Swiss-Prot record:
Disulfide bond entries: 262-271, 264-293, 295-304, 307-329, 332-341, 334-359, 362-371, 374-392, 395-413, 397-420, 422-431, 434-446, 506-576, 520-627
Protein source organism: Mus musculus (Mouse)
Subunit annotation: May form a homodimer.
InterPro entries listed in its UniProt record: Laminin/Netrin_ECM, Laminin_N, LE_dom, LMN_ATRN_NET-like_EGF, Netrin-4_NTR, Netrin_domain, Netrin_module_non-TIMP, TIMP-like_OB-fold
Residues covered by the Laminin N-terminal domain: 30-261
Cellular localisation: Secreted, Extracellular space, Extracellular matrix, Basement membrane
Protein name: Netrin-4
Functional note: May play an important role in neural, kidney and vascular development. Promotes neurite elongation from olfactory bulb explants.
A cellular-component GO term for this protein: extracellular region
Tissue: Expressed in kidney, liver, heart, ovary, testis, retina, brain, olfactory bulb, and widely expressed in embryo.
Signal sequence, start to end: 1-19
Taxonomy, superkingdom: Eukaryota
């Protein structure tokens, strides 16, 4: 088998050994685990050697070759001079095409005992195997080293010697499989054309997955060097009485083939030049293997070693070369309000290893792990999709009529609808006017009219019921005074905002607790102990937010303790809101359900009294004894 045929076979075998043949190649769409094409890493890069033949002056050198029957031919001699290209044998000759330029070689200076050949790479690469073809007899001893930190530290790949034990004190892999030293490639025959072959993933390495941590540790390199430690003579020289020994005292190498590929963790099938790298132009130096991956599977980095900025919802993983699983990075759910996210292991574990992405620097006035809610001082505009940049609108609470939250100097609105918390006697979604029966819009809200009827909302002067009067005092327009530096708060916190109080002209004839049979005869749907949190004038009706502290009775309704909304009889029906429910106070309320809407109604048929423990015990006694 010829030299070229041997090289082709070795390249194919090494690709199989590296476990890469089952992975999608450069012509695939990289839908599964994939890898860039393999090639000679020495092509287009500078090979360094300590010396070169004729580097100081013209030198005469000789070499032997054998016939097919291993009989010696007469030596051939020639001259070398590094200053003349047709007589030079530089290190770059080892990295030209072994097929197009098979008879070019590097040669050391005469009578050199130790020599070094080194390849420096501009990035991390996957190295699979080395093939060296010598023009001189192969060394009696040499070492192949690698570096993974750009030459700061080195680690041996393999020792080569005619006698491993005598030279290095190591066992021979000819005797012990997997030993780090071998005598397979140290025979002086053939005197020219002898090969040294090293496979980075020879047994005992498990090569099922070429992207596993163990395999990466074995294959990743930034530098590769060969230390030639001991020359040996061609046996033909012993029988040649006319030979001059010093003419044969050199190392010479035809080819230095470093087979490998761009290192992409199984997430790319093509690579680009590393920034700043310029390949060396040399005869036959085609198809340079570059080192910067064109990442797929939502990965990023020179080696696809981390997830792309908005794809950190699961931990980054290398692709699985055994199963072909791409292990894609997954997009974070940021609702269109963030450009980047990060992976949080605590969030990941709390979700049962389903989602760990946390959005960074939420935009468009949003906040939260997924930018899923509006910031304090903004509310959700339900007319816009939440992914829209203008989905969160600034609160427009009037700075005078709106209530200030405890421990804060800023007024916030309900983030779900933009409603503002009003001061006592103030009404409107933006708290910008006095309620009916109130006057004097100011820093303390609005004051009740001190009249039998209504009053002027500006002056408080009593007016007759027949007067043509504007019941609402509109306040001039204003601009939001939201301060973004204020601390955030939760709307659900218990607050005592303004109540919807009746005016002086309104009479609320509320139910009293008298005859138990009359109380039971009302057939109330619910009986509750509540605390008034806030009340809101909606124009056509009112809503009272309460905290249910105890459920004394609940028929068909499923009422739980917690926050709920009550719906008093509309002021448009009576000119005021009845019964009276003031914020911060506790009441015992018995009422009915609106069968059409399921709302809890409070009207003139309802029983509403300030809560007292004795009242609660009495009502419970009636419910258990009489209302059965």
């Amino acid at each position: 088998m010829g030299s070229c045929a041997r090289l082709l076979l070795l390249w194919g075998c090494s690709a199989v050994a590296a476990g890469l043949n089952g992975v999608a190649g450069a012509n695939s769409r990289c839908e599964k685990a994939c890898n860039p094409r393999m090639g000679n890493l020495a092509l287009g890069r500078k090979l360094r050697a300590d010396t070169m033949c004729g580097q100081n002056a013209t030198e005469l050198f000789c070499f032997y070759s054998e016939n097919a029957d291993l009989t010696c031919r007469q030596p051939k001699c020639d001259k070398c001079n590094a200053a003349h290209s047709h007589l030079a044998h530089p290190p770059s000759a080892m990295a030209d095409s072994s097929f197009r330029f098979p008879r070019t070689w590097w040669q050391s200076a005469e009578d050199v005992h130790r020599e070094k050949i080194q390849l420096d790479l501009e990035a991390e690469f996957y190295f699979t195997h080395l093939i060296m073809v010598f023009k001189s007899p192969r060394p009696a001893a040499m070492v192949l080293d690698r570096s993974q930190d750009f030459g700061k530290t080195w680690k041996p790949y393999k020792y080569f010697a005619t006698n491993c034990s005598a030279t290095f004190g190591l066992e021979d892999d000819v005797v012990k499989k997997g030993a780090i030293c071998t005598s397979r490639y140290s025979n002086p025959f053939p005197c020219t054309g002898g090969e040294v072959i090293f496979r980075a993933l020879s047994p005992p390495y498990d090569i099922e997955n070429p992207y596993s941590a163990k395999v990466q540790e074995q294959l990743k390199i930034t530098n590769l060097r060969v230390r030639l430690l001991k020359r040996q003579s061609c046996p033909c020289q012993i029988n040649d009485l006319n030979a001059k020994p010093h003419h044969f005292m050199h190392y010479a190498v035809y080819d230095f083939i470093v087979k490998g590929s761009c290192f992409c963790n199984g997430h790319a099938d093509q690579c680009l030049p590393v920034e700043g790298f310029r390949p060396i132009k040399a005869p036959g130096a085609f198809h340079v293997v570059h080192g910067r991956c064109m990442c797929k599977h939502n990965t990023a980095g020179s080696h696809c070693q981390h997830c792309a900025p908005l794809y950190n919802d699961r931990p980054w993983e290398a692709a699985d070369g055994r199963t072909g699983a791409p292990n894609e990075c997954r997009t974070c759910k940021c609702n269109g309000h963030a450009d980047t996210c990060h992976f949080d292991v605590n969030v990941w574990e709390a979700s049962g290893n389903r989602s760990g992405g946390v959005c960074n620097n939420c935009q468009h006035n949003t906040e939260g792990q997924h930018c899923q809610r509006c910031k304090p001082g903004f509310y959700r505009d339900l007319r816009r999709p939440f992914s829209a940049p203008d989905a969160c609108k600034a609160c427009s609470c009037h700075p005078v009529g709106s209530a200030i939250l405890p421990f804060s100097s800023v007024t916030f609105c309900d983030p779900s609808n933009g409603d503002c918390p009003c001061k006592p006697g103030v009404a409107g979604p933006h708290c910008d006017r006095c309620m009916v029966g109130y006057w004097g819009f100011g820093d303390y809200g609005c004051r009740p009219c001190d009249c039998a009827g209504s009053c002027d909302p500006l002056t408080g002067d009593c007016i007759s019921s027949n007067a043509d009067v504007d019941w609402y005092h509109e306040v001039p327009a204003f601009h939001s005074m939201h301060n973004k530096s204020e601390p955030s708060w939760e709307w659900e916190d218990e607050q005592g905002f303004s109540a919807l109080r009746h005016s002086g002209k309104c009479e609320c004839k509320e139910q009293v607790l008298g005859n138990p049979k009359a109380f039971c005869g009302m057939k109330y749907s619910y009986v509750l102990k509540i605390k008034i949190l806030s009340a809101h004038d909606k124009g056509s009706h009112a809503e009272v937010n309460v905290k249910i502290k105890k459920v004394l009775k609940s028929t068909k309704l499923k009422i739980l303790r917690g926050k709920r909304t009550l719906y008093p009889e509309s002021w448009t029906n009576r000119g005021c809101t009845c019964p009276i429910l003031n914020p911060g106070l506790e009441y015992l309320v018995a009422g009915h359900e609106d069968v059409r809407t399921g709302k809890l109604i409070v009207n003139m048929k309802s029983f509403v009294q300030h809560w007292k423990p004795a009242l609660g015990r009495r009502v419970m006694h009636i419910l258990k004894r009489d209302c059965v």
